[in-house]
Amino acid sequence: MRVFPIPLLSHVRGLIRQGPSSRFYVVPALARTNLTISHSEQVKEGTFDYKALELNDIGVLRVLNSMKDDPYLALSFLKRIEGNVTLPSVQAYATVIRIVCGWGLDKKLDTFLFELVRRGDEGRGFSVMDLLKAIGEMEQSLVLLIRVSTALVKAYANLDMFDEAIDIFFRAYYSLGRAPDIKALNFLISRMIASGRSDMVVGFFWEIERLGLDADAHTYVLVVQALWRNDDKEELEKLLSRLLISETRNPCVFYLNFIEGLCLNQMTDIAYFLLQPLRDANILVDKSDLGIAYRKVVRGLCYEMRIEDAESVVLDMEKHGIDPDVYVYSAIIEGHRKNMNIPKAVDVFNKMLKKRKRINCVIVSSILQCYCQMGNFSEAYDLFKEFRETNISLDRVCYNVAFDALGKLGKVEEAIELFREMTGKGIAPDVINYTTLIGGCCLQGKCSDAFDLMIEMDGTGKTPDIVIYNVLAGGLATNGLAQEAFETLKMMENRGVKPTYVTHNMVIEGLIDAGELDKAEAFYESLEHKSRENDASMVKGFCAAGCLDHAFERFIRLEFPLPKSVYFTLFTSLCAEKDYISKAQDLLDRMWKLGVEPEKSMYGKLIGAWCRVNNVRKAREFFEILVTKKIVPDLFTYTIMINTYCRLNEPKQAYALFEDMKRRDVKPDVVTYSVLLNSDPELDMKREMEAFDVIPDVVYYTIMINRYCHLNDLKKVYALFKDMKRREIVPDVVTYTVLLKNKPERNLSREMKAFDVKPDVFYYTVLIDWQCKIGDLGEAKRIFDQMIESGVDPDAAPYTALIACCCKMGYLKEAKMIFDRMIESGVKPDVVPYTALIAGCCRNGFVLKAVKLVKEMLEKGIKPTKASLSAVHYAKLKAKGLR
């Protein structure tokens, strides 16, 4: 085994920078005073003796005043003497505040006053009003007094003492003639909203309006947010109306900021509502300003994942002569991508190309990601190459998507070459680029290349982050390189990056995926601090590896709830295997015991699993458990139970369940009705479906067509076809197969071609079988060859039809050739083609060949039919002349 160059990485020094230490003074209480230097110097040197100084108000003030050039020292001194029995006077605090304000240390002032306010009057020995009075007596600077008022408003707001904060705000205005800073106002309002006091905001704001105090766009956004939360539409309309008729210093800037604030706070509807009168009243006159406002609204709607509404706004833009720019299209495309509506994103992009709109690198990266999300990695890379040949400036994000696509395609070498091309163009790679390439290398088992890239990145001075280490460690584990993965974890710690539970999980799941179950268990046991996430990862890893016994055993040992995704993964895996369905039910019982409510879909999955193995009793038992727990089964659960009863030819039970679901207000859908009609074509469900507003689909029509074909009522069949066309429901290949099976003489190929419906193996089988039944073997073989030429792979059924036809017509040699051809094509013959061939051999006197075929069936574990055994038996008797 190759020794990978981890030691080469470990000697590369980490780029952990030492942050600058903040200035801090230690003032020991037992030091003796040095009389030859000043108080402030003694405090700095740590030689100041607090006991030697009479800590009266004058002495403290004298020391503090000597520290006016050093606010940090003043704060440290005050904090130190606060530990004495006698609290510092209000003048001492006022002096420190004046010093801190004088140096413009607003954050220090905020923290200092927050702690002071939190103590309360008893803890301080004075009231806040006393403090403000003391500051006012010392200082006449309006700026300083406003700063103190601002900090006090924020302190009270932080402590949710809103009445006191409002009181300070208005006291400052009435006594100083100026209100505290606008940021303090906005902070106070935002704290009120966060604390659920939106009602308080409205009254406070109207008083500010009455006094004519300044409010910026952000203030209005917050007030709108409060009204929105209160669902006070009347007040909201009143506010917006007043806003539209009010005069502002710079209306364009104000309204653009206001619209942006509304959009950022997920109130885009209000922003759009406001934009329209602004546009119509020519307040936003310039088209560029209108374009910016529309762009903000579109991006806001996309952020709220309301992409269709965003597209409607784009149409409104175009209607008013505003051309959507690249940023608008970028938001729409990215919104569709995030919403997983990939075809729509690509469609918007194609429309951009047709309109010859400018494309930027953001749109390129979004579109490339769309193709990757669809799994079309080859198309993504081809498109990247097309963009590369244009004059669009591609950035490292676009290249990164291309690296990822090539990695998924197994073309790691090509990805690295592309990486070299990117750096050659002067585009500096970031850690994400290296992470993608390293992940691609590990995915393809090229771990040495992953190490080389890691070393190269270190050489560029870029510090590896936790993500890249996780990818590397997980990749090594997945490739079975357990020791190298463990060494990577050690290297992380040596370089100051602490592995998290995510790191450990990637190693655990990687080792399990590589089949190293013992090493995964050992690694888990070696963890000093095991987290619940690690336990969850063990369960998920065993599920992914198909080790369901290990997964369930570990799960059942845990006495605490796991993330729902883990339950779902294990549950789904258990339901998929018939021998583990009972354990899936045990899992649900365990969830209920731990107080975890299962997803409703899990109930349907379990019932579906029991129904799949035809154990309706178990399915019904669990169904009854849901009823006793007052859990109403969902539509899927009811439908699958009804389908199972229908499949087992128990229509009464199926219909009883159907009536039960309606009683419980579970509305049947077209699938439910289709299942019932498929079981009992005599049911008349048309009126009921109309009452429930259930629109028929192609499956429903196919079932109905099949029903009337059996009744030989072609008039109703054609009426159904006509109704399908009226509803614009295109018949599928199953519909045509049903029609062909009942009326094989009808030529449907032209109509299918018109609807672009391509025949499948079942359709071809019906055609072949019909030609065989009328004795036209040549036409049957021609259709068979046509099926293969069209790219449809035959299964056993068309082969069997041809074999039976050949045997019936006495062409035994040709029948055997078709049988051998079937085996050569990879189709395993079942009992039906064997039975046809045996019957042909017996009918034509080839008894030994028939006996040989029976033995061959038994060797392959295929049980011969009674008819085959009887045919061989009578053929033997006939051959012996005993009949």
UniProtKB/Swiss-Prot annotation:
- Which parts of the chain are PPR repeats? 145-180, 181-215, 216-251, 253-285, 290-324, 325-359, 360-394, 395-429, 430-464, 465-499, 500-534, 537-561, 563-598, 599-633, 634-668, 697-731, 760-794, 795-829, 830-864
Among InterPro entries, the record links this protein to: Pentatricopeptide_rpt, TPR-like_helical_dom_sf
Report the superkingdom from the record: Eukaryota
Q: Does the keyword Oxidoreductase apply?
A: no
Q: Which UniProt keywords apply?
A: Repeat
GO BP, sorted A to Z: embryo development ending in seed dormancy
Q: Which PANTHER family match?
A: PENTATRICOPEPTIDE REPEAT-CONTAINING PROTEIN 4, MITOCHONDRIAL-RELATED, RESPIRATORY COMPLEX I CHAPERONE (CIA84), PUTATIVE (AFU_ORTHOLOGUE AFUA_2G06020)-RELATED
Q: What does the sequence similarity comment in the record state about its family?
A: Belongs to the PPR family. P subfamily.
Protein name in the entry: Putative pentatricopeptide repeat-containing protein At1g13800
